[in-house]
Every structure is written in structure tokens, then in C-alpha cells.
Amino acid sequence: MALALCRMSHSPLLNLPGPRLDLLDEVHAAIAEAAEFVRAYDPDLVVIFSPDHYNGFFYRAMHPFCIGMYASAVGDYGTHIGALDVPTDLAADCAKAVLGADVDVAVSASMDVDHGTVQPLEKLFGTATARPVIPIFINAIAAPLGPLRRCRALGTAVGTFLSTLDLRVLVIGSGGLSHSPPVPTLHSADPQVRERIVHGQPLTPAQRQARQTVVMEAAKSFAAGNSDLQPLNPAWDQRFLEIIDNGHLSDLDRWSNSFVTHEGGSLAHEIRTWISAFAAMAVAGPYQTKVRYYKQAADLIAGFAIRTAVPIP
């Protein structure tokens, strides 16, 4: 087995008008550097740890973790719509191995994924279907959330399974860092929205357009400093990245969910995908990060970060 990693933030605003062109140029240049790393590595298989934003997973049965044996993209924010190339038998074997490692994970033979999964695939490969991919959902939005150490355990179990394969595997993690965009919660949503995030009715084109408009307006206000959204926290982001870069993943076990929310915002819990991805990478031994990028990107409502990593020879 060969193993490499690429971790990157995502933002629907990368696909929408509004962000400053100089910021987009800088972010896209960093993504291009990561994409070149991926191109040179040329993986046979991709495993992506990613969240969802009430497009595929809902409160009617909100799993902490779920491995997709089939997946289809919903096409939000201009991303790919339709089936991904999921190797069903291999995904099922991965789930069996993870369960055998005492990590409770659900499986799905009909997983819907959104931009949190698809955007990194498109940015790194050009298309979302360029490589076989096993999608692994991590709940990072719908409270109650489990402790961060369970995300590390998930990643270790997945990495142990990957170590048995005679394949070149790229592990991707998607999301983070500090950000608190306008996403509904079970307790704050109005009755119509609450019904949708519980029971999962698909958005109509008009509803999806309205949601997109809300995000664009929120980003405009946030970048102008006229927003009630929780500010970004670059100091906290850098602290997290330092822990990741140094391979001290167990240090994050001490971070409570309330601490993550207080310091990083409501969706900073997407760092869970980073923890799982780097824990999978660590199964191959000590690693070194290569591409390192961070930007306090108010226009994207995110502390936007990218890391690539390979095992230390």
C-alpha cells in the first residue's frame, strides 16, 4: 500500500459571485498546488472524509459516521450532480473492518452527498468521477456530537484497513476551519425548515436558489464587518494546524465540543474530518506535511486551510 493525504477547506462561495478576485486567485493558486501534488501521486483509490449540510443526512436518523457503498451528488452550489464512482465491494469491506475495530459506523447503499464531498474532488481532479472514491460521512453539524477521540478512532480503523490494500490510496478530508455560516439548527429553525432538516424533503430549485442567495448576502455582510456571525479565529486555526503538522493528534482528545464551538464557531466541528484523515495517514507511520496554506478568508466565511502529507521515508 502507498498512502498520501490532501486536506482542504471547502466553501460554496468558491463557486458563487461575490468574493474578492485577489482572494480567489490566491486560494485557487494554493488549490492548484495541492492538485499538482495529487496529479503526481496518481492514486488508484480515493477515500474522502466529509461532512454534510442537511442535503443527505437528516435528524430522522443522524449517524455519527457512515460509509457509502453507493453515492450520488445532489449538485448544490453548481457542483457535480449524479453518481460517484464508488467501489461497492471495497466500501463494504472497509465498513466491516471498521466495525471489527470497535468503531460503530453506519453504511449506506444510497448516500446523497453535497458540496462538502464533491467540491474537493472537482478542485483536485477536475471532475468528481475521475477516480474511484469511498465517501465517509462525519456528522459535524447536528448536535449532539460525539467526542473528537471517536473521529481519531474512525480514522485509525480506516487507515488500518487501507494498509491491507495493494493500491495507491489518497485520503482526503474536507471542511473547516473556524467558521459559523448561516446554517439552521434543530432548536433555532422555523417550523418549515425544521421539518426539512428532520425529514429530509429535497429542496426545490427555488428553495435552493433562495438558500444560495442567503449565503451570498451573509458573506457580503460578514466581509464588510456588518454581521452577527461569530468571527473567524485565526489564532485557534493556527493552533489546530500546529497540532496536526506535528502529528500530535491525541492532544485533540482533550478538546471538548463546547470549546470547539466557542473558539471556532458552529461549523468548526468540521475539523473532525481533518482528525480522521490524519489519523488514517498516521497508520503508515510518522508523516510530514508538504503543501501548507492558510487564509483568514472573510469573503468565504471560513478560515481556509490546505495541507498535503506523505509518510516520512
Curated annotation (Swiss-Prot):
Active site: H115 (proton donor), H179 (proton acceptor)
Uppermost EC category: oxidoreductase
Reactions the enzyme catalyzes: 3-(2,3-dihydroxyphenyl)propanoate + O2 = (2Z,4E)-2-hydroxy-6-oxonona-2,4-dienedioate + H(+); (2E)-3-(2,3-dihydroxyphenyl)prop-2-enoate + O2 = (2Z,4E,7E)-2-hydroxy-6-oxonona-2,4,7-trienedioate + H(+)
Listed cofactors: Fe(2+)
Biochemical pathway: Aromatic compound metabolism; 3-phenylpropanoate degradation
InterPro entries in the record: DHPP/DHXA_dioxygenase (IPR023789), Xdiol_dOase_suB (IPR004183)
Alphabetical list of Gene3D superfamilies matching this protein: LigB-like
NCBIfam families in the record: PRK13370.1-4
Subunit record text: Homotetramer.
Protein name listed in UniProt: 2,3-dihydroxyphenylpropionate/2,3-dihydroxicinnamic acid 1,2-dioxygenase
Organism lineage: Bacteria, Bacillati, Actinomycetota, Actinomycetes, Mycobacteriales
